[in-house]
Every structure is written in structure tokens, then in C-alpha cells.
């Protein structure tokens, strides 16, 4: 929205065109805007959640240190998502179909997560939205979105899967393979981030790092100078440049949320936040065809999800025997005696290393 205002004002005030003509400037401005919105609205929202008694539900079989988290305000993901949408509408180019798709993803998955949280925390339904209903909604949306993205990206000739650490090695993809891969990426990422969000600040830092990494790739691929210099296929579509702008909004809002979510957490994001952030990261990776880079940078999420799958599989196939003391795996380390803060910081370090490996792939090709 502001891009059009500054474009008009630039005819009367020299220098203001930088706010409408340069993606890099808008990346900076949207990150600052989303950060300030989240910081400004964070405290009032926490007080409102406390007043409404919308608090965290803690598992009875979990670590004893978690009992103090009971009734900590949750559904704070609404704060993140609202900040991202407002910032995107302010600083994004509203002519970009990709920006609107990302906003739609935030709204749809946010609605699923919100309804799930509402059932569990407000109506006191023990299991919330049934898993099969949640999966059905996610699946239908993901398949439709995958088909839409296939036709949009095929117009730009973006139907090759990029292989990290190589210059010209790509895997061509038809509609069937593309839809299947996109389906698993969106749903897998959504649920993996949801499983990771179990300790104070644990999920939001990896989310910010992955969003930053994907944003860097999006910026490079839509900038002809950088793309040619770094030997990336140039995407001649300014609409996709808005993906980098959107990633910056995720980073700003995520960092501000960490202010309230760091140990001891004053608020949790809930399913409304974790399900949505995971889904939107998956969609971004597909849009810029960096699915494998997303896998590398987000490997922490993959490990968390795999630990749950292995635990459930072992319990069912081995007569109740478990691999881990508790799943997801961050709880396993807690039950081994690691303090919560040590688990979180060490997982952040792992996530940072994975982020840096993903960035190394920009140059080492």
C-alpha cells in the first residue's frame, strides 16, 4: 500500500522513490514495521489472554519443570500473523499474486490453528480439532495450492528442482511429481514446526533463521545482477521479489515475539502460530524452488518430527517399547537432565549451523 503512496509522493519530493523502487529498502522497512507492531501489541495481548484465561495445557507425563507453565497465556501466534499481514499489506506490492497467496496461506492455516486452540483452551475440548479433520483440511488446501503454483511457476520456466552445491544440476518436474512434493513439504513443514514448539523460544528462532535464509535466496534469484554473479537462474518476475519482502516480515515479527516468548515465557504461540509458520515457510521454499535448501536449513524441524514418528512406530511395533524417554526429542533431553534453557540454546546453535550451511551453498556451487 505504501509503495503506491511513496511512488506518488516521489513526483513532488525527491528521494522518496527509494521506498517504492528498491526491494532492499522495503525489506528493511517491513522488518522494522513488523517488529514494532509485535512489540507494541504484545503486552496488551498478553494481558487480554490472561483476562480470558486462555492458558497453556501441560502434559501430566511431561517434565516436572513444565508444570509451572500451566495457564501461561497461549494463542500468541495471532500476534505474529496479524503483524505479518499488516506489514505485508503496508510494504508489499499488492499487484503480486505471490504475496496474496502467502497471505491466504497465513489466513487459512491460521484459521485451522485458531479453531484447534479455541476448542482446547476456551471450550476445554481435550483433543481440540480431530487429527483426521485437521489433516483433511490441510491436504485439500495444499493440493489446490500446489496445482495453482504449478501453473504460475511453469509460466516462468521454474519447473526444475534446484540441487544445492551444484551449478547446473536440476531435476525437471511434471505436474504429478510437483504436486506430490509440494503436498508433503507444506503439510510436513506445518506439523514439524508445530511439534518443535514445545519449549520457551525453541521454535521461533529456527523459524526466523529459515525465513531469513529463504528470503536471501528469493532476493538473489529475483535480482539480475546478483543472480548472474552467483550463477543462479534469474527469475524475471517482480511478483516473486515480494517473497523476500514477506520473509523479512516474518523475521521482524518473529524476533519481537521472542521478546515475550524467551524463558520464562510470558506467552506461547499455540497451534495458530506454529502450524501457520511451518506451512508458509514450506510454500515460500516451493515458490523459489529451493526445497532442498529448506530441508537443510530446517533439518531441526525434520528431526523433531522424525523423533515422534519413530517413537509412535516403536511403541506400536515393539509391544510398547520406546526409543526415547519422551517425544518430541527435546523432551527426551530434558528427561536426561538437561535444563530447559540448555536444550533450547543448543537447538538454536544447531539451527544456526544449518542456516550457515544453507548460506554456504550460495557460493560453493
From Swiss-Prot:
This protein's pathway: Cell wall biogenesis; peptidoglycan biosynthesis
Any one GO CC term of the record: plasma membrane
Protein origin, superkingdom: Bacteria
Transmembrane segments: 22-42, 74-94, 95-115, 134-154, 169-189, 201-221, 240-260, 268-288, 292-312, 342-362
Pfam families (alphabetical): Glycos_transf_4, MraY_sig1
Keywords: Cell cycle, Cell division, Cell inner membrane, Cell membrane, Cell shape, Cell wall biogenesis/degradation, Magnesium, Membrane, Metal-binding, Peptidoglycan synthesis, Transferase, Transmembrane, Transmembrane helix
BP-aspect Gene Ontology terms: cell division; cell wall organization; peptidoglycan biosynthetic process; regulation of cell shape
MF GO annotations: metal ion binding; phospho-N-acetylmuramoyl-pentapeptide-transferase activity; UDP-N-acetylmuramoyl-L-alanyl-D-glutamyl-meso-2,6-diaminopimelyl-D-alanyl-D-alanine:undecaprenyl-phosphate transferase activity
InterPro entries registered for this protein in UniProt: Glycosyl_transferase_4, PNAcMuramoyl-5peptid_Trfase, PNAcMuramoyl-5peptid_Trfase_CS
Membrane topology, as annotated: Multi-pass membrane protein
Annotated EC: 2.7.8.13
Catalytic activity: UDP-N-acetyl-alpha-D-muramoyl-L-alanyl-gamma-D-glutamyl-meso-2,6-diaminopimeloyl-D-alanyl-D-alanine + di-trans,octa-cis-undecaprenyl phosphate = di-trans,octa-cis-undecaprenyl diphospho-N-acetyl-alpha-D-muramoyl-L-alanyl-D-glutamyl-meso-2,6-diaminopimeloyl-D-alanyl-D-alanine + UMP
Membership in a protein family: Belongs to the glycosyltransferase 4 family. MraY subfamily.
Function: Catalyzes the initial step of the lipid cycle reactions in the biosynthesis of the cell wall peptidoglycan: transfers peptidoglycan precursor phospho-MurNAc-pentapeptide from UDP-MurNAc-pentapeptide onto the lipid carrier undecaprenyl phosphate, yielding undecaprenyl-pyrophosphoryl-MurNAc-pentapeptide, known as lipid I.
Name this protein carries in UniProt: Phospho-N-acetylmuramoyl-pentapeptide-transferase
Amino acid at each position: 500500500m505504501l509503495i503506491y503512496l511513496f511512488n506518488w509522493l516521489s513526483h513532488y519530493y525527491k528521494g522518496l522513490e527509494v521506498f517504492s523502487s528498491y526491494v532492499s529498502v522495503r525489506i528493511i522497512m517491513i522488518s522494522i514495521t513488523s517488529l514494532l507492531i509485535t512489540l507494541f501489541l504484545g503486552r496488551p495481548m498478553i494481558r487480554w489472554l490472561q483476562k480470558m484465561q486462555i492458558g497453556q495445557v501441560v502434559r501430566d507425563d511431561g517434565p516436572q519443570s513444565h508444570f509451572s507453565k500451566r495457564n501461561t497465556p497461549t494463542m500468541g501466534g495471532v500476534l505474529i500473523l496479524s503483524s505479518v499481514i499488516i506489514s505485508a499489506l503496508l510494504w508489499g506490492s499488492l499487484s503480486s499474486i505471490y504475496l496474496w497467496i502467502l497471505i491466504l496461506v497465513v489466513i487459512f492455516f491460521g484459521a485451522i490453528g485458531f479453531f484447534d486452540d479455541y476448542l482446547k483452551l476456551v471450550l476445554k475440548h481435550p483433543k481440540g480439532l480431530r487429527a483426521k479433520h485437521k489433516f483433511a483440511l490441510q491436504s485439500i488446501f495444499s493440493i489446490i495450492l500446489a496445482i495453482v503454483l504449478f501453473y504460475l511457476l511453469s509460466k516462468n520456466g521454474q519447473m526444475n528442482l534446484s540441487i544445492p552445491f551444484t551449478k547446473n544440476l536440476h531435476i525437471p518436474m511434471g505436474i504429478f511429481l510437483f504436486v506430490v512434493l509440494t503436498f508433503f513439504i507444506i503439510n510436513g513443514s506445518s506439523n514439524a514446526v508445530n511439534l518443535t514448539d514445545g519449549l520457551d523460544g525453541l521454535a521461533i528462532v529456527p523459524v526466523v533463521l529459515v525465513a531469513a535464509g529463504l528470503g536471501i535466496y528469493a532476493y538473489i534469484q529475483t535480482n539480475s545482477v546478483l543472480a548472474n554473479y552467483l550463477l543462479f537462474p534469474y527469475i524475471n518476475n517482480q511478483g516473486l521479489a515480494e517473497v523476500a519482502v514477506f520473509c523479512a516480515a516474518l523475521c521482524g515479527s518473529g524476533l519481537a515475539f521472542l521478546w515475550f516468548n524467551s524463558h520464562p515465557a510470558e506467552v506461547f504461540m499455540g497451534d495458530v502460530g506454529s502450524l501457520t509458520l511451518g506451512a508458509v515457510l514450506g510454500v515460500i521454499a516451493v515458490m523459489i524452488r529451493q526445497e532442498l535448501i529448506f530441508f537443510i536449513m530446517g533439518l531441526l524441524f525434520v528431526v523433531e518430527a522424525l523423533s515422534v514418528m519413530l517413537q509412535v512406530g516403536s511403541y506400536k511395533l515393539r509391544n510398547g517399547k520406546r526409543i526415547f524417554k519422551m517425544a518430541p526429542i527435546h523432551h527426551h533431553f530434558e528427561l536426561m537432565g538437561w535444563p530447559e534453557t540448555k536444550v533450547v540454546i543448543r537447538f538454536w546453535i544447531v539451527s544456526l549451523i544449518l542456516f550457515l550451511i544453507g548460506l554456504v551453498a550460495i557460493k560453493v556451487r
